[in-house]
Amino acid sequence: MTTQYGILFKQEQAHDDAIWSVAWGKNKKNGSETVISGSLDDLVKVWKWNDEKLDLQWTLEGHQLGVVSVDISHTGSIAASSSLDAHIRLWDLETGKQIKSIDAGPVDAWSLAFSPDSQFLATGSHVGKVNIFGVETGKKEYSLDTRGKFILSIAYSPDGKYLASGAIDGIINIFDIATGKLLHTLEGHAMPIRSLTFSPDSQLLVTASDDGYIKIYDVQHANLAGTLSGHGSWVLNVAFCPDDTHFVSSSSDKSVKVWDAGTRTCVHTFFDHQDQVWGVKYNGSGSKIVSVGDDQEIHIYDCPV
């Protein structure tokens, strides 16, 4: 029995406002799977994925304004959230308690990402800097300076070597983390870069932009390997599949699309949301996709592996 693409589960009214961010994590100790959602209702919600459904485990309160970005550490034990209140909060996923609140300073920290070793948390800023905080210390350890505009999106490469940032003017920068040097500046888009994602082997970088296009870059040589069109509006999020072959995108055209990175073609489109889809992620095995959007719903889809 091969799995077909299809919607598996729908959590309606998951939040009282638009859901702008989602993450899917797996606890390395006990194997349990967790989905976390961040919403403009100021809340972070922690859901257990069990028996093919989501069960609300915790509602995490603390942010004073909307939550715009969430991530789960690679150990699966800590969640991070950033908000329009300029604070980053770290949460213990086993107790639902806040571990620490980090004042990001007078910056708009729109996007955050755990480093692959879960030791650091990177966040973009409106002054073109990527600030790196220590997860243990909660202090800013160092910054990477793009000398550019407002950074809307960031991503670590899974091998821990690179950090990519996407700015509001469509510029993408790739840093060498070990040296802090700016390796490549990519100018493929003319509009804001909402999201970027590395392939599991860290060889490719996929970018999503308000120009409606998705671009695939060869990281090492900074070559444009492909331009994909298909969404009818802004592309808001992209995430690579653990199978190293597929990636998923979401858009303000209300759709979620699965792409084959090798053939550069769309293999499936989900039209299940009623409004723009802000966040999309794969689970650890690549067999499921989660999406969230302005319709306040969380959707889980089945994917053939």
Curated annotation (Swiss-Prot):
Location of the protein in the cell: Nucleus; Cytoplasm
Family matches, as Pfam families: WD40 (PF00400)
- Location (main, coarse): nucleus
Task: Report the SMART domains cross-referenced here.
Answer: WD40 (SM00320)
The UniProt record lists the keyword Nucleus: yes
Segment forming the signal sequence: none
In which ranges do the WD repeats occur? 14-57, 62-101, 104-143, 146-187, 188-227, 230-269, 272-305
SUPFAM superfamilies xref list: WD40 repeat-like
What does UniProt give as GO cellular component?
Cdc73/Paf1 complex; cytoplasm; euchromatin; nucleus; Ski complex
Q: Which InterPro entries match?
A: G-protein_beta_WD-40_rep, SKI8, WD40/YVTN_repeat-like_dom_sf, WD40_repeat_CS, WD40_repeat_dom_sf, WD40_rpt
PROSITE patterns on file? WD_REPEATS_1, WD_REPEATS_2, WD_REPEATS_REGION
What Gene3D superfamilies does the annotation carry?
A: YVTN repeat-like/Quinoprotein amine dehydrogenase (2.130.10.10)
Tell me the keywords, alphabetical order: Cytoplasm, Nucleus, Repeat, WD repeat
Instruction: Provide the GO biological process annotations.
Output: negative regulation of myeloid cell differentiation; nuclear-transcribed mRNA catabolic process, 3'-5' exonucleolytic nonsense-mediated decay; rescue of stalled ribosome; transcription elongation by RNA polymerase II
Question: Its biological function?
Answer: Component of the PAF1 complex (PAF1C) which has multiple functions during transcription by RNA polymerase II and is implicated in regulation of development and maintenance of embryonic stem cell pluripotency. PAF1C associates with RNA polymerase II through interaction with POLR2A CTD non-phosphorylated and 'Ser-2'- and 'Ser-5'-phosphorylated forms and is involved in transcriptional elongation, acting both independently and synergistically with TCEA1 and in cooperation with the DSIF complex and HTATSF1.
What's this protein's family per the entry?
A: Belongs to the SKI8 family.
Q: Output the PANTHER family linked to this UniProt entry.
A: SUPERKILLER COMPLEX PROTEIN 8, WD REPEAT-CONTAINING PROTEIN 61
Q: How does it assemble?
A: Component of the PAF1 complex. Component of the SKI complex.
**What name has this protein been given in UniProt?**
Superkiller complex protein 8
The organism named in the record is Gallus gallus (Chicken)
